[in-house]
Amino acid sequence: MEEFPCDVIRYEAYVYGVCEFRLPFFLPSRNFSIIAHIDHGKSTLADRLLELTGTIQKKQAGKNEQVLDKLKVERERGITGKSNHSMIDKFKGKDYLLNLIDTPGHVDFAWEVSRSLAACQGALLLVDASQGVQAQSISVFHNAKERGLKIIPILNKIDLPAAQPERIAAQMQATFGIDPSDILHISAKTGQGTQEVLEAIISRIPPPSGRIHAPLKAFLFDSFYDRYRGVISLINVQEGVLRKGDKISSCHTRKKYEITELGILHPEEVPTQSLNPGQVGYIACNMKQSSEAHIGDTLHRAGEPVEPMEGFQETKAMVFAGVFPVDNSDFPKLEESINRLTLTDRSVTIQRESSSALGQGCRLGFLGTLHMDVFRQRLEDEYDANIIITAPTVPYKVVYHDREVIISNPTEFPEVTDATARVKEIQEPVVKASIIVPEEYFGDLMELCYSHRAEDLDHRYLDSGAVSSRIMLNCILPLSEIVTDFFDQLKSRSSGFASFDYEDAGYRKSDLAKMSFLLNGKPVDALALIIHRSAQEAVGRQWVKKLHKVIPRQLYEVPIQAAIGKKVIARETLKAMRADVTAGLYGGHYERKMKHLENQKEGKRKMKKMGTIDLPQEAFFDILSNKS
């Protein structure tokens, strides 16, 4: 692989070779992120910027590569997980190194937005000129503002017939206090106005501060795993110079490493001889475990300790689910696949789990339901895993008289109706939700929130005009209510116009209980749920009907029950298959026929008493889907 000397300013891969341009002096840089609501055009704008600077080959209009979305699941779902690219642009006869530290747009990955912004001095706030300011536009704006970043407001998709740039610019002024004259109007798809974006990055965003002769101080903001080189850390050099062969130490773990490779992403990995103050790049240092690359850690030269920079709080799993192989003999392979995948996604928590119905598996913790779905799809795409995922749950807090316990597995939830359990109260996690919706759908959205146990509702008008007025609805919602079908119902009731964002708001006391499902009087542990009492009867009836549809008929009658403690709240009966035991009788007395029927009845009674119902794996697929 070609290596940059420390003063290379451009690296372009052409069809017939590699071209390098060098400068004999230090190259000024700008570190920035693109922040926006999901689907407002972050990846497309990044493609245009990379094309304009010659970092990637220019494509025809509309044929962008979505360079930031490297995973198959990211391209299919239109989401960006995490990325980092360097490019070089000339402004007023001078070359600049521009480091794009991209951020995900979905609410599940808000934690990754925070860590990306920590390595930047500026942010491009992208707003769709047809959709306007959305819920996550507001949250990412405040996140960037709190960190003191210079914000460049941009209206994207001005080429759309439905675009209303003047109205949306006024909306941004009212919501963010932004001067409309500072807003850039672009179309990332066609490239219109994107050159002005590059100029604004250089002229408006301040350069990173840092002294080249100061002791080394580098900020670790991300990492990924390479099967040959181990953990690759993405860093922002704050002060000093980092070179290949340097010995470094971690402020967090106190472990020491030697730099075996370092460089920039342009857009793929390009090794360099050094990283200077303000530059963003990658390092390989024979780090074996992802847990060693502590996000927010400060790296310094071994033997030259420095004051550590402010780090981050650890990620907190918000949604838990059991993952089991369809074939129990595949568990070792599944466990190895999960462990490998978590090397590239450190926010997933793992714990072994055993189920009498599904066998051996793992209980995984995720940042949200989209994160869970992305992880599942990556398991299937990259490791060809055939898995069953149980219904998602959230971490509940069980308060006893002498202690508190966090429980994320329904099978471990105590029977609150049992006085001997000594449970003082149950608390559930809640979130502060923000919903932006056109006025005509406001009533439906209020009803949706109330049906999902929303509290402390308030609202305000964001804007008004000839076309429509939009309302921001704020409320406190139980996390368990939004990990199921809340988002789908939100989009359905608003015809797709509502946007949704939330943040953790701690725990609140709640009236919850464990619902068990019994087949022939025996509980199925993999189907246990934790349900609020207001929804127990409806959920119980819904699930027993689902079970009734998918369980194969037996030779004896099978009662299907939903129970809270010892109280049965819903029941369906699966009728027995009838075998004609009198078919072989060609005559004789009536009592002979009755004797055969009585023997059959007695046999079925014994089978019902002794028999167990084995749910086929196909039945679990149907039951654990969201289909009713």
Swiss-Prot record:
Residues 27-209 form the tr-type G domain. GO terms for cellular component: mitochondrial inner membrane; mitochondrial matrix. SUPFAM superfamilies: EF-G C-terminal domain-like, P-loop containing nucleoside triphosphate hydrolases, Translation proteins. Disulfide bonds: none annotated. Keywords: GTP-binding, Hydrolase, Membrane, Mitochondrion, Mitochondrion inner membrane, Nucleotide-binding, Protein biosynthesis. Pfam families: EFG_C (PF00679), GTP_EFTU (PF00009), GTP_EFTU_D2 (PF03144), LepA_C (PF06421). GO terms for biological process: positive regulation of translation; translation. It comes from the Eukaryota. It is an enzyme of class 3 (hydrolase). It is found in: Mitochondrion inner membrane. The keyword Protein biosynthesis applies. The keyword Kinase does not apply. It catalyses: GTP + H2O = GDP + phosphate + H(+). One of its GO terms (molecular function) is mitochondrial ribosome binding. Its EC number is 3.6.5.-. GTP binds at residues 36-43, 102-106, 156-159. It is a peripheral membrane protein. Promotes mitochondrial protein synthesis. May act as a fidelity factor of the translation reaction, by catalyzing a one-codon backward translocation of tRNAs on improperly translocated ribosomes. Binds to mitochondrial ribosomes in a GTP-dependent manner. NCBIfam families: lepA, small_GTP. This protein may be expected to contain an N-terminal transit peptide but none has been predicted. Belongs to the TRAFAC class translation factor GTPase superfamily. Classic translation factor GTPase family. LepA subfamily. This is Translation factor GUF1, mitochondrial. It comes from Laccaria bicolor (strain S238N-H82 / ATCC MYA-4686) (Bicoloured deceiver).
